[in-house]
């Protein structure tokens, strides 16, 4: 229901039981190895594409959903949903890339980091 108009139904949701939860977990586990084998560049491309979609063609949709679901004004929704979500996606790609860089180290020292999704 809408937080500002309690009689207005925004959506109806199905509540799955234990079997549905187990199926969802199994589906996630079955794709874990594939995601782990995906290169950083490809993962980054996926997240940056999502950011571009949120900042572009889906901007009005995400803002409208935020306005309805959280009783935000158009200005609040723009800041809290479209802009911030796209920024988070882009920032996290940038930050993940920085994790692969070598930190400042003494001569002859090399640091390695293995990230496991």
Language model segments and positions:
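Conserved small-residue-rich beta-alpha loop and adjacent elements
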Residues: 98-117
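Glycine-rich loop-to-alpha-helix module at the N-terminal edge of alpha/beta enzyme cores
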Residues: 6-100
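Glycine-rich phosphate/pyrophosphate-binding loop
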Residues: 1-5
């Amino acid at each position: 229901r809408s937080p500002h108009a309690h009689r207005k139904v925004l959506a109806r949701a199905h509540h799955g039981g234990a079997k549905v939860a187990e199926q969802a977990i199994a589906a996630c586990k079955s794709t874990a190895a594939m995601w782990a084998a995906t290169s950083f560049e490809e993962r980054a491309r996926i997240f940056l594409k999502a950011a571009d979609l949120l900042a572009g063609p889906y901007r009005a949709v995400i803002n409208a959903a935020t306005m309805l679901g959280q009783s935000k004004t158009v200005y609040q929704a723009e800041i809290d949903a479209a802009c911030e979500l796209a920024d988070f996606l882009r920032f996290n790609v940038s930050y993940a890339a920085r994790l692969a860089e070598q930190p400042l180290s003494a001569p002859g020292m090399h640091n390695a980091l293995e990230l496991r999704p």
